[in-house]
Curated annotation (Swiss-Prot):
Subcellular location: Cytoplasm
Pathway as given in its UniProt record: Nitrogen metabolism; urea degradation; CO(2) and NH(3) from urea (urease route): step 1/1
Organism in which the protein naturally occurs: Pseudomonas syringae pv. syringae (strain B728a)
The protein's Enzyme Commission number: 3.5.1.5
Assembly and interaction partners: Heterotrimer of UreA (gamma), UreB (beta) and UreC (alpha) subunits. Three heterotrimers associate to form the active enzyme.
Statement: the UniProt record of this protein carries the keyword Hydrolase: yes
Keyword vocabulary terms for this entry: Cytoplasm, Hydrolase
MF GO annotations: urease activity
The protein, known as: Urease subunit beta
Keyword Translocase: no
Biological process per Gene Ontology, one example term: urea catabolic process
InterPro entries: Urease_beta-like (IPR002019), Urease_betasu_sf (IPR036461), Urease_subunit (IPR050069)
Length: 101
């Protein structure tokens, strides 16, 4: 093995397999771009984003870890959300939950 070498098994990795997903239309009603990271509790995003907020409780963007989605002012786009996993306790973010979902 060469130092730093990767040994990757053949095949594909399916992200978030078996988790519930939801598609929502999200619009940026503000005057500045808004970027939302992969593991941000979508329910608690910037209030300038308009969407069915109640439906997004306990969910995050269904995108690879470390990536984000950017919403330009006036832009509307469809996003896919996925259920948060683990203990399903949410602390921090905008402070709208601060406990169990």
């Amino acid at each position: 093995m060469i130092p730093g070498q990767y040994q990757i098994q053949p095949g594909d990795i399916e992200l978030n397999a078996g988790r519930r997903t939801l598609s929502l239309t999200v619009a940026n009603s503000g005057d500045r771009p808004i970027q939302v990271g992969s593991h941000f509790h979508f329910f608690e995003t910037n209030d300038a984003l308009t969407f069915d907020r109640a439906a997004s409780r306990g969910m995050r963007l269904n995108i690879p870890a470390g990536t984000a989605v950017r919403f330009e002012p006036g832009q509307s786009r469809e996003v896919e959300l996925v259920d948060l996993a683990g203990l399903r306790k949410v602390y921090g973010f905008a402070g709208r939950v601060m406990g169990e979902l």
